[in-house]
Regions:
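Conserved hydrophobic beta-strand within the GNAT/NAT acetyltransferase core sheet
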Residues: 39, 72-75
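Conserved active-site alpha-helix within GNAT-family acetyltransferase domains
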Residues: 55-56, 63, 77-96
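Terminal substrate-recognition subdomain of acyl/acetyltransferases
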Residues: 74, 92, 99-116
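Acetyl-CoA-dependent GNAT
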Residues: 1-41, 45-47, 58, 64, ...
Length: 116
């Protein structure tokens, strides 16, 4: 994605960044539509892969948008690493289309009780 695209997303308040010691190590592009949050993209700089930043960002996103009922996202079907990552985080595959795998995670509301 181009610099101009990221600039536009930042101006529209969709772009979130993760920094460490003043350097951007990752970020996310988020779209809130009613009570559904779509994670348009989440990214970590390659030199920071496998350091827990992706998991940290996903946890923070879920905490920031605690009132949403569902979080959706997609990733390429060929990317085994990201598909495994989202499943590990509790996302459920809802469909495959045009080389993408679509995932959803429905969140419990305060009026719902999880039975264990």
């Amino acid at each position: 994605m181009s610099v101009s695209f990221h600039t536009q997303m930042a101006r529209q308040e969709h772009l979130y960044k993760l920094t460490e010691e003043g350097l951007i190590v990752g970020g996310a592009i988020l779209f809130l539509q009613g009570n559904v949050l779509n994670i348009g993209r989440i990214f970590v700089a390659p030199e920071h892969f496998r350091k827990g930043y992706g998991s940290f960002m996903m946890q923070e996103i879920e905490s920031m948008f605690i009132g949403v009922k569902e979080i959706t996202l997609d990733t390429p079907d060929w990317n085994i690493r990201t598909n495994t990552f989202y499943i590990k985080l509790g996302y459920t595959e809802i469909k495959r289309d045009r080389g993408l795998v679509y995932y959803s995670k429905r969140k419990l509301t305060e009026n719902m009780i999880r039975l264990t």
